[in-house]
């Protein structure tokens, strides 16, 4: 099973890793906004160069990014076909067996492809450089003011942290079950789509049981340690901004202004 899109945190000592997670979340959100408001070649070139700089600074493996993009190749192909069939904007460039291909369709395909690649790449880098604990701490710290009006931010942060932790665990468990089935002679690559789906059904029951077992073990461990979302808890690592964090805020805001103008 391809889990490139759901990357694990890779602990390294880089500039990107050492940024405050709140700054990284803000940067990623605004980068995604810039990706979808960008339209011309210069704007996308700025975003691509920024992404390349982040990849280099974070020491993220290019091969890992390529594998992540491959994971959404079917989605890109599907959206491209939709543009070819339904996008009638622009002039007719080609005509094959009565099927007209418009310039607007090709432009739409180019835009959606670049946007998909940039979105996946920035999310993969973010997940590889920010641990689940840092993400939840950043959310809890940023939205802590809502706790005063009765919104259970601590509970939400706990649920998010456990969810992020369980995703790679479930994927590893799925791979283990699939390997066990393959060793017994099962072949998940042969047959029609319906047959492939039926072959995955026997995986669901042991996966469901294993997931419940892991969840029960986690709940027991938290209960034994007296964990509570209502009490005041100290932090092992206190979030604190530094100069690089403020610089990242300024950088993404400047880039956004350049793209809008």
Language-model regions, residue ranges each:
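Loop-to-transmembrane-helix entry motif
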Residues: 68-72, 76, 113, 117, ...
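Alpha-helical transmembrane segments and their helix-start/interface "positive-inside/aromatic belt" motifs
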Residues: 24, 62-73, 245-248
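Juxtamembrane/interface alpha-helical elements of multi-pass membrane proteins
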Residues: 73-186
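Small-residue-enriched core segments of transmembrane alpha-helices in multipass membrane transport
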Residues: 49-56, 69-77
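Membrane-helix interfacial "entry" motifs
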Residues: 13, 36, 59-64, 96, ...
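Alpha-helical membrane-interface segments at transmembrane helix boundaries
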Residues: 66, 70, 107-111, 201
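Transmembrane alpha-helix interface motif
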Residues: 1-41, 47-58, 144-151, 155-158, ...
């Amino acid at each position: 099973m391809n889990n490139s899109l759901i990357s694990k945190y890779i602990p390294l000592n880089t500039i990107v890793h050492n940024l405050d997670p709140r700054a990284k979340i803000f940067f990623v959100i605004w980068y995604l906004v810039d990706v979808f408001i960008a339209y011309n070649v210069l704007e996308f070139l700025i975003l691509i160069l920024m992404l390349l700089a982040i990849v280099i600074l974070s020491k993220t493996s290019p091969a890992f990014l390529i594998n992540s993009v491959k994971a959404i190749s079917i989605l890109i192909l599907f959206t491209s076909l939709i543009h070819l069939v339904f996008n009638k904007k622009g002039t007719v460039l080609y005509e094959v067996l009565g099927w007209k291909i418009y310039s607007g369709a090709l432009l739409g395909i180019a835009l959606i492809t670049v946007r998909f690649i940039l979105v996946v790449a920035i999310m993969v880098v973010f997940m590889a450089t920010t641990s689940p604990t840092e993400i939840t701490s950043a959310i809890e710290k940023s939205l802590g003011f809502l706790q005063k009006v009765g919104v259970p931010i601590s509970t939400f942060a706990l649920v998010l942290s456990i969810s992020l932790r369980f995703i790679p665990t479930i994927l590893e468990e799925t791979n283990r079950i699939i390997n066990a089935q393959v060793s017994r002679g099962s072949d998940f690559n042969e047959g029609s789509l319906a047959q492939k789906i039926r072959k995955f059904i026997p995986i669901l029951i042991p996966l469901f049981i294993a997931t419940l077992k892991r969840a029960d073990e986690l709940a027991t461990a938290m209960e034994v340690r007296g964990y509570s979302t209502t009490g005041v808890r100290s932090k092992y690592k206190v979030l604190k901004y530094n100069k690089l964090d403020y610089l990242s805020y300024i950088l993404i805001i400047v880039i956004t202004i350049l793209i809008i103008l």
